[in-house]
Design a protein with these regions (language model features):
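Short beta-strand-loop/turn "lid" adjacent to the catalytic site in phosphate-handling enzymes
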Residues: 71-123, 144, 150-159
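Adenine-nucleotide phosphate-binding core of ATP-dependent small-molecule kinases
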Residues: 266, 273-277, 284-319
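Glycine-rich beta-strand-to-loop/alpha-helix junction loops that act as flexible
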Residues: 9, 90-93, 209, 323, ...
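Internal helix-turn-beta structural module
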Residues: 299, 303-324, 333-401
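Glycine-rich phosphate-binding loop of actin/hexokinase-like ATP-binding domains
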Residues: 151-255
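Catalytic phosphate/nucleotide-handling subdomain of diverse soluble enzymes
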Residues: 219, 225-257, 266, 330-361
Length: 401
């Protein structure tokens, strides 16, 4: 069974086509600059070779059609015809409180996702464009929505509510939702398989660290807390997002600088974090190089970045009354040994010991703690697309029973 996974952004569409009987990736790629000059599709051929196809892509329906044309292309396609695609799974950012799991898309689901656009104004409208496009181009093919927020719906109320007047939760749904849920769900399940331990009784801290970053406390296979909040802005210091900040500092800067709410949002989301402190780049690899050169601002930025992660690991250990596994994933978590060792260097009180040799691993599943470490520290590369495809297939199978 072939399942197509789409991740639609405001000016991009990423795709992966899976053969679900073997979990093999048959095709993958993405369109950039939708609605802008110079739009193109970049695909990876089965032999690893990259190919770029330039074409004017004014909107998402044209983009999805471009992907379909590419998938069926005689030279570099992956299917003979589109009838081979049995379902399409979509990454949808925000499901609010409406969705605690993945769902078959129908008119009611679309209406509910539209209602959540206020909560995910940058992502949900783009996710919907992908859904509308497939409805138009492949109307008979079932579609499934997999929500970034769903995994965190098991958080208790005392963890997800903000201590502001309760009426704002009742009126506007102001609460912590959390994100990267599909990634946290995948890696927390996968690490139990990898270590040969049951999810029941496990206490796992999953650190998804990339340009965006979040941590989740996963107890018995369920999320009990996570660092991101109403939006992906809360929590860790990230590439361009500030993470936790005193609300008073926000209103103070707005008054001093005469900033509108939208301008302040841009400052906190696009101009802060590593970029705001380091001022040269938001890329952790460039920061690492600057630290190696002894640049003081780079060293300060890195210390802040690691400290936030370490602090949350300590907090979530307390929240779960212990920890068995600390897991690193995401672009930085999977590939940057200095980040992992930097985060773990003050976790000795938990009995964490990192093996410097094992920690050299990049992008592969590995235990990087020593044999006598009281807590297992593990790298598990995330695979959100496979998780989306698996959910899609499971829902399709349940329909056919």
């Amino acid at each position: 069974m072939k399942v197509l996974v789409l991740n639609c952004g405001s000016s991009s569409i990423k795709y992966k086509l899976f053969e679900m009987t073997t979990k093999e990736v048959l095709a993958q790629g993405g369109i950039e600059k939708i609605g802008l000059p110079g739009s193109f599709l970049k695909l990876t051929l089965p032999n690893g070779e990259k190919k770029i196809l330039e074409k004017d892509v004014p909107e998402h329906t044209t983009g999805v059609q471009f992907i379909f044309d590419t998938l069926t292309n005689a030279e570099y396609g992956a299917v003979n015809n589109l009838h081979e695609i049995k379902a399409v799974g979509h990454r949808v950012l925000h499901g609010g409180t409406k969705f605690s799991g993945s769902v078959l898309i129908d008119d009611a689901v679309i209406a509910a996702v539209e209602e959540c656009c206020d909560l995910g104004p940058l992502h949900n409208p783009a996710n919907l464009k992908g859904i509308y496009a497939v409805q138009k181009l492949l109307p008979e093919v079932p579609q499934v929505a997999v929500f970034d927020t769903a995994f965190h719906q098991t958080m208790p109320d005392y963890a997800y509510l903000y201590p502001i007047p309760y009426q704002y939760f009742e009126k506007y749904g102001i609460r912590r939702y959390g994100f990267h849920g599909t990634s946290h769900r995948y890696v927390s399940k996968r690490v139990c398989e990898y270590l040969g331990i049951p999810q029941e009784g496990s206490k796992i801290i999953t650190c998804h660290i990339g340009n965006g970053g979040s941590i989740a406390a996963v107890k018995d296979g369920k999320c009990i807390d996570t660092t991101m909040g109403l939006t992906p802005l809360e929590g860790l210091m990230m590439g361009t997002r500030c993470g936790d900040i005193d609300g008073g500092a926000i209103t103070y800067i707005m008054k001093k600088e005469g900033l509108t709410p939208d301008e302040m949002s841009t400052l906190l989301n696009k101009k802060s974090g590593v970029l705001g402190m380091f001022e040269k780049s938001s890329d952790m690899r460039e920061l690492e190089d600057a630290v190696a050169r002894g640049e003081e601002r780079a060293i300060l930025t890195e210390n802040m970045y690691f400290y936030r992660i370490t602090k949350y690991i300590g907090a979530y250990t307390a929240a779960m009354d212990g920890v068995d596994v600390i897991l690193f994933t995401g672009g930085v978590g999977e590939n940057q040994a200095t980040a992992r060792s930097g985060v773990c260097k003050t976790l000795g009180y938990l009995g964490v010991k990192i093996d410097p040799e094992k920690n050299k691993v990049r992008g592969k599943e590995a235990i990087i703690s020593t044999d006598d470490s009281k807590v297992k520290v593990v790298v598990i590369p995330t695979d959100e697309e496979l998780m989306i495809a698996t959910d899609t297939m499971d829902i399709l199978n349940s329909m056919n029973k």
